Amino acid sequence: MDSVHPGGLGGTYGGNPVATAAALAVFEAVEEDGLLEKARRIEQVIREHFEQNADDRIAEVRGRGAMMAIEFVDPATGEPDATLTATVAAAVRAAGVILLTCGTYGNVVRFLPPLTIGEDLLKEGLSEVTKALQSA
């Protein structure tokens, strides 16, 4: 390609040098701060927590990196349990931890902690989920 034909490049922000520099800075920060490794560790901590605190109302712990989720079901039927999910989420919010509920049936709690979260704080938040589940 020797040159771009008229109308061949579009978009107000396409190839913007400032946006390109910002993207490069983000990639450098991800590498320098070890954020990929931190995401992997967050996943490991969440999975280990729910393995150690198994509950038959948790159908699945899923996700990758820092974006994880747990799915709640009625253990007798295997049906999604949106009521339990809402109860757990409300109790955890009352304890000061922000959780998002989601899923087609409203029976999933999603975790998306910042990559910079300290492990102690992450474990404290997960403990609140376990306490809420045990009292539900």
Segments predicted by a language model, with ranges:
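Conserved N-terminal phosphate-binding loop of PLP-dependent enzymes in the Aspartate aminotransferase
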Residues: 1-136
